[in-house]
């Protein structure tokens, strides 16, 4: 006698933390799914009657007909209204726009004669089958999966994620996935596909080798209100489902400590999201496409990398780094360029001014005019060395206008005091006001030229934003505006001397590590 195939049922599995199992009728009746309590989908783009499903237990397949307006996807086939597709066991139905995945599963039943047909969504209840029928639910509860919403950070933990002592970290866009449309930026939530076919196999190997798989992705458009967080969450769940391995996903939604290349996401992983298990930097790796590669870095790759943030993220941590092509395709390492400014090279010591032979302070009344980018260290230096020695501090940010600055300077000089002008003063015209004040009072006027470059000043401003909530952010428009307006000071303007002030790192040790991190790619 031929072997009788074990009877069973087809059911749909939601992503970790999603809806409970959805059992499909085995008698040929249609089941309509869409937005609602059965799927726990609230996406308004998903119709309440999005798809019609008819299960065939004999072939273990499901016929899928799209009823809604927006596209559903069966496996890799995108449907249209009225069109049909099919699912086999292990295939995934994306309800709408490539989101809200439901994977078809088969569950064998050992005593079918005692098991009457039950409505969709009702678990099997025979004594012999209770344990098997509850497996999907138990698996989800045990893994404690789902999303955690923190300030400026989203964290997703899929079922099956375990704490490990080594991490295989990945960027998302351009590393694990790319756009299906071929455009640089996705046209919608369903515009994605796995970047290379080699990726799923490699990820399975890493999981088998004991790596924790983690995605670190910057998504500033969420913080700016241009990308709904719930839409991106659904996309992440769909991507993780497609990759077929348990991932933890950290999403930086704003600028600051969490945004790569700053290491805040990694710090959160180590301190709060790995159950206290220490992570070995040397045994871990990070893979990303923002690697600072120049134009024509490989045959057919004409565009240079848009950023170096992924490579710098790894560099900040001391992690081994690879690009997707090097890691998944075994391409030879490509050349790359690091930013012109390296914060690790900033000195804490050295001469306060150049030339060193010049005195920093004057015993007699004078005017000192500072010149330098916002963030060049002017206020810190002047307060530490001049204001503390009795100089009157004149600053437009506190006084409100250059007219008040001039008045304050004139008043101080009439009182026989020394004055430090703490403004950017980029051109001769802005400096001439204070040269004239000194000339009218019959005292010398010196210029302190703060030599921090544009890139160093931008780094300093980002550091201030991360460490001082009272600091008003300085936009790049202001920074580049200063550079455009800048005129190098000369003695011909009326200065008695021009001293160069190199930037020195004046931060407490606990902040030194953060300052020395690359903060922009």
UniProtKB/Swiss-Prot annotation:
Expressed in many tissues with highest expression in spleen and testis, and lowest expression in small intestine. Expressed in higher amount in pancreas, heart and kidney and at lower levels in brain, lung and liver. ATP binds at residues 372-379. This is Bifunctional polynucleotide phosphatase/kinase. Residues 146-337 are annotated as: Phosphatase. Residues 341-516 are annotated as: Kinase. Plays a key role in the repair of DNA damage, functioning as part of both the non-homologous end-joining (NHEJ) and base excision repair (BER) pathways. Through its two catalytic activities, PNK ensures that DNA termini are compatible with extension and ligation by either removing 3'-phosphates from, or by phosphorylating 5'-hydroxyl groups on, the ribose sugar of the DNA backbone. In the N-terminal section; belongs to the DNA 3' phosphatase family. Coiled coil: none annotated. The lineage of its organism: Eukaryota, Metazoa, Chordata, Craniata, Vertebrata. It is found in: Nucleus; Chromosome. The FHA domain binds threonine-phosphorylated peptides from XRCC1/4, and is responsible for the recruitment of PNKP to the sites of DNA repair. The affinity is ten times greater if peptides are also phosphorylated on the serine preceeding the phosphothreonine. Its main location: nucleus. One of its GO terms (cellular component) is membrane. InterPro entries: FHA_2 (IPR041388), HAD-like_sf (IPR036412), HAD-SF_hydro_IIIA (IPR006549), HAD_sf (IPR023214), P-loop_NTPase (IPR027417), PNK3P (IPR013954), PNKP (IPR006550), Polynucleotide_phosphatase (IPR006551). Its EC number is 3.1.3.32, 2.7.1.78. It is linked to Microcephaly, seizures, and developmental delay: An autosomal recessive neurodevelopmental disorder characterized by infantile-onset seizures, microcephaly, severe intellectual disability and delayed motor milestones with absent speech or only achieving a few words. Most patients also have behavioral problems with hyperactivity. Microcephaly is progressive and without neuronal migration or structural abnormalities, consistent with primary microcephaly. Ataxia-oculomotor apraxia 4: An autosomal recessive disease characterized by cerebellar ataxia, oculomotor apraxia, areflexia and peripheral neuropathy. Residues 127-137 have a biased composition (Basic and acidic residues). The modification Phosphoserine is found at residue 114. Pfam families: AAA_33 (PF13671), FHA_2 (PF17913), PNK3P (PF08645). Monomer. Interacts (via FHA domain) with XRCC4; mainly interacts with XRCC4 phosphorylated by CK2 but is also able to interact at much lower level with unphosphorylated PNKP. PANTHER family: BIFUNCTIONAL POLYNUCLEOTIDE PHOSPHATASE/KINASE, BIFUNCTIONAL POLYNUCLEOTIDE PHOSPHATASE_KINASE. It comes from Homo sapiens. It catalyses: a 3'end (2'-deoxyribonucleotide 3'-phosphate)-DNA + H2O = a 3'-end 2'-deoxyribonucleotide-DNA + phosphate; a 5'-end dephospho-2'-deoxyribonucleoside-DNA + ATP = a 5'-end 5'-phospho-2'-deoxyribonucleoside-DNA + ADP + H(+).
């Amino acid at each position: 006698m031929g072997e009788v195939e074990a009877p069973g049922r087809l059911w749909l599995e939601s992503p970790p933390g999603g809806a409970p199992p959805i059992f499909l009728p085995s008698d040929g009746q249609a089941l309509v799914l869409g937005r609602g309590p059965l799927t726990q989908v609230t996406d308004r783009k998903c119709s309440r009657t999005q798809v019609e499903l008819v299960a065939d237990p004999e072939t273990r397949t499901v016929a899928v007909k799209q009823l809604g307006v927006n596209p559903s996807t069966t496996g890799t086939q995108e449907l249209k209204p009225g069109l049909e597709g099919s699912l086999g066991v292990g295939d995934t139905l994306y309800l709408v726009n490539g989101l809200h995945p439901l994977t078809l599963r088969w569950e064998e039943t050992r005593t079918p004669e005692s098991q009457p047909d039950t409505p969709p969504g009702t678990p099997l209840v025979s004594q012999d089958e209770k344990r098997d029928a509850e497996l999907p639910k138990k698996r989800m509860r045990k893994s404690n999966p789902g999303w955690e919403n923190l300030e400026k950070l989203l964290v997703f933990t899929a079922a099956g994620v375990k704490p490990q002592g080594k991490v295989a970290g990945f960027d998302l866009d351009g590393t694990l996935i790319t756009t299906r449309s071929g455009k640089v930026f996705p046209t919608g939530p369903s515009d994605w596909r796995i970047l290379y076919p080699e990726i799923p196999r490699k990820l399975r190997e890493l999981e088998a080798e004991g790596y924790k798989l983690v995605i670190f992705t910057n998504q500033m458009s969420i913080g700016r209100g241009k990308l709904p967080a719930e839409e991106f969450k659904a996309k992440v769940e769909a991507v993780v489902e497609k990759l077929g391995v348990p991932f933890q996903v950290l999403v930086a939604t704003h600028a600051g400590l969490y945004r790569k290349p700053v290491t805040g996401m990694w710090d959160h992983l180590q301190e709060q999201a790995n159950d206290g298990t220490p992570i070995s930097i040397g045994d871990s790796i990070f893979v990303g496409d923002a690697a600072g590669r120049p134009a024509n870095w490989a045959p057919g790759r004409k565009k240079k990398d848009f950023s170096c943030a992924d490579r710098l993220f790894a560099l900040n941590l001391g992690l081994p780094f690879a690009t997707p092509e090097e890691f998944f395709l075994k391409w030879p390492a490509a050349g790359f360029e690091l930013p012109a400014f390296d914060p690790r090279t900033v000195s804490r010591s050295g001469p306060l001014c150049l030339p060193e032979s010049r005195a920093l302070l004057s015993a007699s009344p004078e005017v000192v005019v500072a010149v330098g980018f916002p963030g060049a260290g002017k206020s810190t230096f002047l307060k530490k060395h001049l204001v503390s020695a009795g100089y009157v501090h004149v600053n437009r940010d506190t006084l409100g206008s250059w007219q008040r600055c001039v008045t304050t300077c004139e008043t101080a000089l009439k009182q026989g005091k020394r004055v430090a002008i703490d403004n950017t003063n980029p051109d001769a015209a802005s400096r001439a006001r204070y040269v004239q004040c000194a000339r009218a009072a019959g005292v010398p006027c010196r210029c302190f030229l703060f030599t921090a470059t544009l890139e160093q000043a931008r780094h300093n401003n980002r550091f201030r934003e991360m460490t001082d909530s009272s600091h008003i952010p300085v936009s790049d428009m202001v920074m580049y505006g200063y550079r455009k307006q800048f005129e190098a000071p000369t003695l011909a303007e009326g200065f008695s001397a021009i001293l160069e002030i190199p930037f020195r790192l004046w931060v407490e040790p606990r902040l030194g590590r953060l300052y020395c991190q690359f903060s922009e790619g």
